[in-house]
């Protein structure tokens, strides 16, 4: 019985230690996140960067804002394509349901505008976004996607080109209708 008591005490001590360490890590993530967000919004990008890297390494699923703001840090402030790729990959891994079509579209735009990937690689990313929800993609990317479909199918499958044209046009119209609604709401306020 003495062995049982010793074992139970050791087990409880271990569980308490694990729980406390998890709470400390969670608390540290929250503190670093708040510092990061405040620094980012104040445009103190160097300070934000340090906390952001900590969040990217240790608190990957804390908030989608780590990736929304992080994309700006990686692409516009640091101009670091490797970091931008990491933001893209981790955001899709940890927040797969938070607007993935737009994430694909935005990343394709970044690669395309900075000439960091081949047209084929950009098309493949746009294809993923289009398959999820074309209305979440930018109009320019819908055009680039359509151009990619045309280039790949004009000689072998013209019907696919026509079908894609109709589909893209419909999605552009949906986007434009959405913009019109926002303008009306904005003008009414």
Identify the role of each PLM range.
Residues 1-26, 71:
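Bacterial Sec-dependent N-terminal signal peptides
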Residues 23-189:
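Preference for long, solvent-exposed alpha-helical segments and helix-linker "stalks"
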